[in-house]
């Protein structure tokens, strides 16, 4: 194949765009996706994970958003999830961030908080069990079971759900989240962080009334109260690292908490965030394609564009996109498209999409294979991409 210059295209998907402080060379983004390639104690497997991100930053000017990290010891209780709340964690992530930057790419580190869920075998360790009994564990606004009444992780592991969340607990979460953001940017050298209000997890649970009135009265009841935790956390993070280094992710079509006011809640949040933080790097929204109850196809009436129009620029859309839908969505002003599964199975994805090359199919069975290189760093680059490297 005679390969033309990579970004010569009429489609906006392949054209440069400025996001926050970053000058990207195209509008295809690596979406955050949990992959469990981490030690049981939260320490990332540096060599393995570095190779993964090195491969996926092979096209200069790409923005990569990492899998979600726990910001503190009380942020969650799943095993094999990376953490960033001490110096050892920072030192483990530094080479990963550096590898991305060495490829002239950019990285935002995402943080999440679980709503009080602990994996049951996580408690088999005596030291951990003592911490749980002393209240040093992931917290929930209510102490109620996990989403939809099921207490199981993404791997089908049984979960233990813990304690009511006080105002003091909320303030502690804000502090640990902010400290983690500072570690990400000033310690690891990341370009920014992404705040995670998605899929029924802790911040989402507050906004979508997942706890009813079983919480501190300042943080429940009215929509203004329910939004308070997120807005206070966002303000703290922004004050610590700057608006341009912060992105915000939502899942407006998730029905985890079956909140009849979900649309109004997301509209309220977007307006408040835009009003208070007009220079935020981006808003990142998940399409109604892939949720717990199966595959939902995008329609003209049901997609994220209404939220994009409320927000303005820049805007990232994610969720089940293929090449055609990505090109279509990128025609919207200052819109980027994030890929999760396709970026996993195609380390040179922006190149393949540019030249309409066949895509590797992902292997779902290896998505959450703990600490394994299989289905993680063994997907092949395209021959055409490798040929361009020979020319260089």
Curated annotation (Swiss-Prot):
<keyword id="KW-0521">NADP</keyword>
<feature type="binding site">
    <location>
        <position position="341"/>
    </location>
    <ligand>
        <name>FMN</name>
    </ligand>
</feature>
<feature type="binding site">
    <location>
        <position position="196"/>
    </location>
    <ligand>
        <name>substrate</name>
    </ligand>
</feature>
<feature type="binding site">
    <location>
        <position position="34"/>
    </location>
    <ligand>
        <name>FMN</name>
    </ligand>
</feature>
<dbReference type="InterPro" id="IPR045247">
    <property type="entry name" value="Oye-like"/>
</dbReference>
<protein>
    <recommendedName>
        <fullName>Putative NADPH dehydrogenase C5H10.10</fullName>
        <ecNumber>1.6.99.1</ecNumber>
    </recommendedName>
</protein>
<keyword id="KW-0285">Flavoprotein</keyword>
<comment type="subunit">
    <text>Homodimer or heterodimer.</text>
</comment>
<keyword id="KW-0288">FMN</keyword>
<dbReference type="GO" id="GO:0005829">
    <property type="term" value="C:cytosol"/>
</dbReference>
<feature type="binding site">
    <location>
        <position position="199"/>
    </location>
    <ligand>
        <name>substrate</name>
    </ligand>
</feature>
<feature type="binding site">
    <location>
        <position position="368"/>
    </location>
    <ligand>
        <name>substrate</name>
    </ligand>
</feature>
<keyword id="KW-0560">Oxidoreductase</keyword>
<feature type="binding site">
    <location>
        <position position="196"/>
    </location>
    <ligand>
        <name>FMN</name>
    </ligand>
</feature>
<dbReference type="Pfam" id="PF00724">
    <property type="entry name" value="Oxidored_FMN"/>
</dbReference>
<dbReference type="GO" id="GO:0005634">
    <property type="term" value="C:nucleus"/>
</dbReference>
<dbReference type="GO" id="GO:1990748">
    <property type="term" value="P:cellular detoxification"/>
</dbReference>
<feature type="binding site">
    <location>
        <position position="249"/>
    </location>
    <ligand>
        <name>FMN</name>
    </ligand>
</feature>
<dbReference type="GO" id="GO:0003959">
    <property type="term" value="F:NADPH dehydrogenase activity"/>
</dbReference>
<dbReference type="GO" id="GO:0010181">
    <property type="term" value="F:FMN binding"/>
</dbReference>
<dbReference type="GO" id="GO:0016491">
    <property type="term" value="F:oxidoreductase activity"/>
</dbReference>
<dbReference type="InterPro" id="IPR013785">
    <property type="entry name" value="Aldolase_TIM"/>
</dbReference>
<dbReference type="InterPro" id="IPR001155">
    <property type="entry name" value="OxRdtase_FMN_N"/>
</dbReference>
<comment type="similarity">
    <text>Belongs to the NADH:flavin oxidoreductase/NADH oxidase family.</text>
</comment>
